């Protein structure tokens, strides 16, 4: 997936989450003016079902957002890998320093998740 496609999907997912959260807040504050108990029970039941549905969609959106951010991080990390060096250049590499750098990058990424 290209960077532009990932960012577009990220924007769509955040917009969807915003809409679902607004709908969830609207459903949570829904009141009825009916006096009959059966009607109120029906409205409350329908309201709870709608809240459950909106919450489920919100959770799915957050899961999609987590997956997208992981893909973006992986893509960024893979683009940071340098080109393959010649044997002379490989001898001059400090492997201990590279190991420490890799461990610090991995720990930083893991701590963000």
From Swiss-Prot:
Which InterPro entries does the entry link to? Med22 (IPR009332), Med22_Saccharomyce (IPR016530)
GO CC terms in record: core mediator complex; mediator complex
Provide the protein name: Mediator of RNA polymerase II transcription subunit 22
Q: Does the keyword Coiled coil apply?
A: no
| Subunit and partners | Component of the Mediator complex.
The record's listing under Gene3D superfamilies reads: Mediator of RNA polymerase II transcription subunit 22 (6.10.280.160)
Question: Where in or outside the cell?
Answer: Nucleus
Q: Does the keyword Amino-acid biosynthesis apply?
A: no
For this UniProt record, give its keywords in alphabetical order, as a comma-separated list. Activator, Nucleus, Transcription, Transcription regulation
One biological process term in Gene Ontology? RNA polymerase II preinitiation complex assembly
Q: What does this protein do?
A: Component of the Mediator complex, a coactivator involved in the regulated transcription of nearly all RNA polymerase II-dependent genes. Mediator functions as a bridge to convey information from gene-specific regulatory proteins to the basal RNA polymerase II transcription machinery. Mediator is recruited to promoters by direct interactions with regulatory proteins and serves as a scaffold for the assembly of a functional preinitiation complex with RNA polymerase II and the general transcription factors.
Single GO molecular-function term? transcription coregulator activity
Q: Which organism is it from?
A: Candida glabrata (strain ATCC 2001 / BCRC 20586 / JCM 3761 / NBRC 0622 / NRRL Y-65 / CBS 138) (Yeast)
Which domain of life does this protein belong to? Answer: Eukaryota
> Which protein family is named in the record?
Belongs to the Mediator complex subunit 22 family.
Matches recorded under Pfam families: Med22
Q: What is the lineage of its organism?
A: Eukaryota, Fungi, Dikarya, Ascomycota, Saccharomycotina
